[in-house]
UniProtKB/Swiss-Prot annotation:
This is Chaperone protein DnaJ. Binds 2 Zn(2+) ions per monomer. InterPro entries: DnaJ (IPR012724), DnaJ_C (IPR002939), DnaJ_domain (IPR001623), DnaJ_domain_CS (IPR018253), HSP40/DnaJ_pept-bd (IPR008971), HSP_DnaJ_Cys-rich_dom (IPR001305), HSP_DnaJ_Cys-rich_dom_sf (IPR036410), J_dom_sf (IPR036869). The lineage of its organism: Bacteria, Bacillati, Mycoplasmatota, Mycoplasmoidales, Mycoplasmoidaceae. SMART domains: DnaJ. Pfam families: DnaJ (PF00226), DnaJ_C (PF01556), DnaJ_CXXCXGXG (PF00684). Belongs to the DnaJ family.
Amino acid sequence: MSSKRDYYEVLGVSKDATDDQIKSAFRKKAMQYHPDRNKEPDAEEKFKEVNQAYEVLSDPDKRANYDRFGHEGVDGQFGGGAGFDPFDIFNQFFGGGRGGGAHFEQSFGGSGFEDIFSNFFGGGRRGASSQQREANLVVSIVLTFVESVVGVKKTIEYKIEKDCESCHGSGADNSEGSISTCSNCNGSGVEITQKRTIMGIIQSQNICSRCNGEGKEIHKKCNSCKGRKVHEERVEIDVEIPGGVSNDEHLKVSGKGSVVGGKTGDLYINIQIKPSKIFSRKGNDIYVILKVDPILAIVGGEANIPTPFGIKSIKMKPGTRNGEIITVPSHGVKSTKRFGSNGDLFAVVEYTSAKRFSSAELKSLSKFAQETNDEIEKYLKEARKEIN
């Protein structure tokens, strides 16, 4: 990007936006442009731009300077300098995951990834930290609503990267002189720049522009991997998805990521849940429509309620009303939190159209229809008051 955009425009908020509105906008934009989710060529640049905007607008002092002086008032103030690490901000923002489920070291709620990306990028220089970023993988799977509630075993197929065996992950040919210490940063991976602003001279630490923070320069690429340092490999694993997961939750499977720089990364499974035509979820509670014949509702009897665990038969009391809610305890979503409570299932009674009756049956029913209904009489009494 040739010039910096207005930070409020970047996050899509107004200049009088509240802290909560800024946080909400950042969450949405950061997830949209994260390079491990968005493969567009400019995704990483947009991700950095979003994080820069949030670092300024979420800090009262920086925001005040920005509102007064524009970009010049905050340039060089980013944590780590102009070459600041946007993933540090991302990780600080998306914290607070919860303890895991079966076969998973850790799971993370839809509100954030916690340490999914904390290992992806380090601050200042790349080197081992960028290797860790490449080693960790995110794979999305789709579950039905019922699978998300009761749990399911899934086979996941995905690609990993492994260190090139020829160059051992260096990307350089094995011949002498094919790789050397970076002449620009002397192997540190960073370079120091100074910028004069209206607030004085600000010194910044940036990722080395020559070696991109690696500290090494490759003069002759490896013939096997063509300088990529890794080879791709397709793998397949079976995982037990625990019951109770939420949409956009992330489950961590340790040691199932790529192998880069001699380090094995982790696999993060992104859960996507298909909407149900029968059930809806609020927290750990499940809601379902209970179709009931009006005659059965009047006289009472057995009714069948769909639950994620199967059809459950219940005894309906006589005079059950349309819209009445019947609670089925412990048939909701199982809590995956240590001190959380399991949910219940709430069945909302919905009358169906009455079935067809024979002439004899209608004659018998008509006797009951002619009897006085107190609710109707009360309604008509109120109506007569308004009419007269």
